[in-house]
A protein has these predicted regions:
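Glycine/proline-rich active-site loop of Rossmann-fold NAD(P)-dependent oxidoreductases
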Residues: 120-122, 159-168, 201-210
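SDR active-site lid
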Residues: 124-129, 133, 156-191
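Substrate-positioning beta->alpha
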Residues: 93, 134, 152, 183-200, ...
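NAD(P)H-binding glycine-rich loop region in Rossmannoid oxidoreductase-like domains
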Residues: 30-95, 99-102, 202-206
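Conserved Rossmann-fold NAD(P)-dependent oxidoreductase catalytic core, especially the SDR/UDP-sugar
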Residues: 7, 27-29, 35, 77-87, ...
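Alpha-helical substrate-binding/gating segment
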Residues: 190-227
Length: 227
C-alpha cells in the first residue's frame, strides 16, 4: 500500500484516479481548492485536504506532502488566463516538486499533455503560449529532480467510455500540429483511460524517467506502458 497525495484532486481525471487507487488498496489524500468539494472526495474513499495550490505557502505545501510516499500532479488552471496559468501550471507545479524532495518522497507522476516541450515553437502572443510554456517548464523541473518521475502526455480528453487501451506515440504521429485532432480522432482519449494510466504507471518501474505520450489506441494500458 502506498500513501498517495493527488494535487488537483477534484479534477475529472483525478476523481477517477483517486477512486481507482483507493479500490487498489492505497491510502489517498486528495488536495482540493474548496471545502465544498469534501463530500465528493469522501465518497470515493479518499481523504480531502483543502489546499489552494495557487496561494499555498511553502509551509502549507510541505505539510500537505509530508507523510506521503507518492505525489500525483493533476492540477491545472483550466484556461483561466495567462497569469493564473503560469501561477498554477508552472509555479505551483514546480513548488510541489521541491516540496516532494524536501519531504523525502521518491515517486511522482505528473499529468502533462501530448507534445509538451520547451521547443514548442509558439510565439508569446499565441493563445496557447501560456499553457504550453507553463507545462513545459514544470515538466523540465520534474525531469531535473531527484524523484522517480513519470510524465504522462495524453491527447485531447473526452468523456467517452474507457477502452482500457491506448496508443503510444509523439504528437506528430497523432495528427500533426496542436490544433489537429487527426482524421480519426487518434489524439483523443477518455479521461477514464488517462486515470487508469496514472494508476498503472505508479507501480511500474518501467515508466520511471519517461515522458509517455499517448492517445486512443488498441494496446492494453499496462502492456503499452511497459514498452
Amino acid at each position: 500500500m502506498s500513501k498517495i497525495v493527488i494535487l488537483g484532486g477534484h479534477g475529472a481525471v483525478a476523481m477517477i484516479a483517486g477512486r481507482k487507487l483507493v479500490e487498489a488498496g492505497h491510502q489517498v489524500t486528495s488536495a482540493i481548492r474548496s471545502a465544498d468539494q469534501k463530500t465528493e472526495i469522501e465518497a470515493i474513499g479518499a481523504t480531502p485536504l483543502v489546499l489552494d495550490l495557487q496561494e499555498a505557502s511553502t509551509e502549507q505545501l510541505d505539510a500537505a506532502i509530508a507523510g506521503h510516499d507518492t505525489v500525483v500532479w493533476s492540477a491545472g488552471a483550466g484556461g483561466a488566463g495567462a497569469e493564473i496559468t503560469f501561477a498554477v501550471d508552472r509555479d505551483a507545479a514546480q513548488r510541489s516538486v521541491d516540496a516532494a524532495q524536501r519531504a523525502g518522497v521518491k515517486r511522482s507522476v505528473m499529468v502533462s499533455y501530448q507534445g509538451s516541450s520547451l521547443e514548442h515553437g509558439l510565439s508569446e502572443d499565441h493563445a496557447f503560449y501560456p499553457y504550453v510554456q507553463a507545462k513545459a517548464e514544470a515538466d523540465e523541473t520534474l525531469r531535473r529532480s531527484d524523484l522517480d518521475w513519470t510524465i504522462l502526455g495524453p491527447g485531447f480528453l473526452t468523456d467517452d467510455e474507457p477502452t482500457g487501451t491506448i496508443g503510444l506515440g509523439p504528437l506528430e504521429e497523432f495528427g500533426g500540429d496542436r490544433e489537429s485532432a487527426g482524421p480519426n480522432g487518434e489524439r483523443n482519449i477518455s479521461r477514464s483511460d488517462v486515470a487508469q494510466t496514472i494508476v498503472d504507471a505508479l507501480d511500474m518501474t518501467e515508466t520511471v524517467g519517461k515522458f509517455i505520450e499517448y492517445g486512443r489506441g488498441d494496446t492494453p494500458i499496462r502492456e503499452a506502458l511497459a514498452r
